Amino acid sequence: MNKKQKVIVSLLKEIDEICRQNNIMYYLSPRLTLCAVTEQPFPQNPLFGVVLMKVEDMERFRRLIEEDPREKRALESMKSHKWFPGFYLRYENTDTICINLDRTRDYEYPGIGVNIFPLRTSSVSGTAKSRISRAENGWTQLCDINQTECGYKNRINRTLMRLQCLINGRQRQASRLYERFCREFQGEGAEQYILRRRKQTLTFPAEIFAGTKTVTLEGEEFQVPAGTEEYLTICYGNNYREIQEARYVIPSSMIVSARVSYAQFWKEEGNYEKYCKERQKNSRRLVKARKYKKYFNECWKYVVLCGARMNLGIFYKSRKDYIMNLYKNEDYMALEKVFRPYYRMTEKSLQKGELFAEDVEIFDIYVDTLEKTGRTVQRSKISSLI
């Protein structure tokens, strides 16, 4: 193992010791459980240090660490940091550095750490679940300044959350959201537990987490769910033993080191706060530039379509006499063959909510040909626009 992996294992071991001393149940993440069960090496990705806890246990763990903080360690959450990106905890080694330069404000102490994700109960009422879901979505959207795509509902949730932050203050709003989350999603007698991540949501039967068993990972003992096989099957499928760890390459936007602390690094490199502000400005400019680029690309595609439509219109005008003659003779088979390019161009125009009618007489002949040859789908689309 390299030094970064050793730091993560040491943090996992500290979490294990704290939980055992205080009767708190925790479980290794599916990825780490897979590595332990299949005897694969510890993941290279520094973000794969993850454990799971039930919501009430996670809150107990947070309070224990706050009451008895450890040297060169930090526990972050929405309760303590107004830019924290979600409903989870992060236990960090402050003598290291692990920072995404595109998300510089996510953590107050950007060191190598272990994320503690909550197992949510499914017994929450529909109204409360919907309310928390909207709030979580709004908070996530507000924290992710680099997001390029944002749907209508996401924009509404983000706007409402921004207004609430302006009224209550961002730190107070973050703390309220976290407290409401803990209050709503904890409770005994749950039939299912839900693990919600940024890109994936998994649902587990409660029996899986009824107890724990011990596994060995890199020479250290950790806890995993008693129903390990079902746990891994839900996450990775029946062939989970065949899954191999992909080769990991640190992205250019990441700085990861176990040899130097984030404070020392920025002391040598320059003003951290100033750098974060400049980086955020550049990120916003980049997001705007991408939006403009997408808009200009769509405009250019429309210009190309209009040019192709104009050229095809000129072509059909040059063959107008021939088309009129076929129409007088009611030769619809020949007309259908002649109008094939016209049909394709009409389809493209209808996608834009427009008609391809460069010449009215030719267009009328084309519509009549559609009706006579049984192409009623496009005929009905044209009728809705006329």
Question: What name fits each language-model region?
Answer:
Residues M1-R20, R62-R134, G138-C235, E242-K281, ...:
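Conserved catalytic core of two-metal-ion nucleotidyltransferases
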Residues D16-G49, M53-E59, E207:
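Active-site nucleotide-donor binding segment shared across nucleotidyl transfer reactions
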Residues M310, M345-F356, I386:
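Boundary/linker segments of alpha-helical solenoid repeat arrays
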Residues C299-V303, M333-M345, R375-I386:
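Alpha-helical repeat scaffolds
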